[in-house]
Amino acid sequence: MLRASGCLLRTSVAPAAALAAALFSSLARCSLLEPRDLVASSLSPYFGTKTRYEDVNPLLLSGPEAPWRDPELLEGSCTPVQLVALIRHGTRYPTAKQIRKLRQLHGLLQARGSRDGGAGSTGSRDLGAALADWPLWYADWMDGQLVEKGRQDMRQLALRLASLFPALFSRENYGRLRLITSSKHRCMDSSAAFLQGLWQHYHPGLPPPDVADMEFGPPTVNDKLMRFFDHCEKFLTEVEKNATALYHVEAFKTGPEMQNILKKVAATLQVPVNDLNADLLQVAFFTCSFDLAIKGVKSPWCDVFDIDDAKVLEYLNDLKQYWKRGYGYTINSRSSCTLFQDIFRHLDKAVEQKQRSQPISSPVILQFGHAETLLPLLSLMGYFKDKEPLTAYNYKEQMHRKFRSGLIVPYASNLIFVLYHCENAKTPKEQFRVQMLLNEKVLPLAYSQETVSFYEDLRNHYKDILQSCQTSEECELARANSTSDEL
């Protein structure tokens, strides 16, 4: 619950089906619907990995439980026989580290307010004073946990997928669902909320029981799949714990684009520029995103930045994702081979069972992980690769880049493999086809831009990864000195 101008906005527990309507209705009642309140939506496309799922799929604002069927999805004589989905957790709280930085910035503004009484140069109440008085409701215990909005993300995704693929999510198949999750609570809670959404699909109108009481039982924790990066010694040594691996991130923080924002924000908030740094700017920007995503409200933190600032801050976030999870270092993506191979083992088994006229043992496999799970896998498959690497020095040249993490892995993002069996196939090869969906939209093949592939062709294209990429070898540290594989 958030207090704004004397009104209480009860948005944190409102059904997401009415998110937009409830928000604007509440704002109108509280006399807050001013032109400046549109800033939140104008900044929303630039929040990177803190982006709301509905900002990537705006149709969900009006119907979050109704599936949107991509016209490119196969139908007719081709029947889906298996679905393998990799799903990022839903909307979450900031981490404890982010909350501590926000508390530091908030304290800086409060100290500034006590010095000058919170008045601007004209004597009017200024933005710095408004931020000093804005309730700092984040607490350390929150530490990246799933919020109620995140549970809604998952329940509604379950309802949409069950409606889009009714044969796969049939009541008969419910007991054959396979759920795998990261050990992080936000992922475990996301998988539980997804199951509750399926219960709602099967038993409309009835409140779902605890997951432990469902016939299916709790999901299986498997960090070697969902958090493969934590189990890769080469990645941990050469990237995660390497002080120079994120050189371009640190260089951009002190570059002209970020320094211009730093000076502007210092002037706006009337604090010494030396008291601010790029990390504090980023936490202020993300606080705007958290308030919007978690509570559905636009806070004064959003007024600190304009769209040009947001684009620069988005690039800073994308630089980190690029060099730590994407194409920056080969090990980032190669460490995900084990997950990629696991997906194809499921598909292989389904093809084999169908060829033998046996029932598919696992028609639906749902795997709950992180943005850090999805980005390396998509990079391994060749998606969202720009001609030139993202660096600290080519921000303007990369304005139209493919690698934009907010469009790829927002909260509740999902990569789905759908295996089809086609009855009227002329050859055995044509019997099995595959489509991929990213965030519920058909994802063209990275190597051909076609929207569907014969399964055999897809497998052949990724033959090297499936046959030659051994995690134990990829993640083993070199015995002798070797050169960096920086792009």
UniProtKB/Swiss-Prot annotation:
Gene3D superfamilies: Phosphoglycerate mutase-like. GO terms for cellular component: endoplasmic reticulum lumen; extracellular space; plasma membrane. This is Multiple inositol polyphosphate phosphatase 1. Keywords: Cell membrane, Endoplasmic reticulum, Glycoprotein, Hydrolase, Membrane, Secreted, Signal. It comes from the Eukaryota. The gene is MINPP1. Glycans are attached at residues 242, 481. Its EC number is 3.1.3.62, 3.1.3.80. The active site is at 89. GO terms for molecular function: 3-phytase activity; 4-phytase activity; acid phosphatase activity; bisphosphoglycerate 3-phosphatase activity; inositol bisphosphate phosphatase activity; inositol pentakisphosphate phosphatase activity; inositol trisphosphate phosphatase activity; inositol-1,3,4,5,6-pentakisphosphate 3-phosphatase activity. A motif (Prevents secretion from ER) lies at residues 484-487. Belongs to the histidine acid phosphatase family. MINPP1 subfamily. It is found in: Endoplasmic reticulum lumen; Secreted; Cell membrane. It is an enzyme of class 3 (hydrolase). Residues 1-30 form the signal peptide. Pfam families: His_Phos_2. It catalyses: 1D-myo-inositol hexakisphosphate + H2O = 1D-myo-inositol 1,2,4,5,6-pentakisphosphate + phosphate; 1D-myo-inositol 1,2,4,5,6-pentakisphosphate + H2O = 1D-myo-inositol 1,2,5,6-tetrakisphosphate + phosphate; 1D-myo-inositol 1,2,5,6-tetrakisphosphate + H2O = 1D-myo-inositol 1,2,6-trisphosphate + phosphate; 1D-myo-inositol 1,2,6-trisphosphate + H2O = 1D-myo-inositol 1,2-bisphosphate + phosphate. N-glycosylated. The lineage of its organism: Eukaryota, Metazoa, Chordata, Craniata, Vertebrata.
